[in-house]
Amino acid sequence: AGGWVAVVVILVICLIGLLVSSVFGIFFSGEDSGNGMTMQTVVQEINTEYDSRLDEIKNENAYDVLEMSGSRAVWKEVLAVYSVKTTTDQDNPQEVATMDDNKKQLLTDIFWEMNEISSRTESKTETVITETDDGHGNIVQTETTQTRTYLYITVSHKTAEEMADQYGFDDEQRQMLSELLADENNSLWSQVLYGISVG
């Protein structure tokens, strides 16, 4: 009986090893592998870099009105693309359960390939009507023109599907991507990104 237990234990260890080294290893990436880096800390750093780029644009331009539009890619999609691309790389396949400087750079590059920030300024001359009292109880309307500078910041993003096209993913890689992004994995994504275990 003891022999069977050993076989079962070995099989379980092998299965866990296979899972961790597959695209699903991303769901184990919340732990520090000894270098102080986790998926959460790297995502926070990239988010900070993203916010800094937005602030940079605001600080570099003199403006009266700020108009922001668009949205960035959902982190779950960025990480799914990273996981498939990294584990199935023909030249240098790597597991994604751990994080290091090299993988951090890969993830950062994918994030910026999926997210683009563009900006422009435009001067507009607008008519402003001000109402004043003439001192005798009469309202006097005065029209003046003002030139105001508008700063437009647009964030555009690519979906996981668009990145699969860009990277030339084959059918098997697209299937992996689809499985990672399935709704039943949402609680696993929450755990990876926020350390939150749901349900």
Language-model features: locations:
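Membrane-proximal envelope biogenesis segments
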Residues: A1-V198
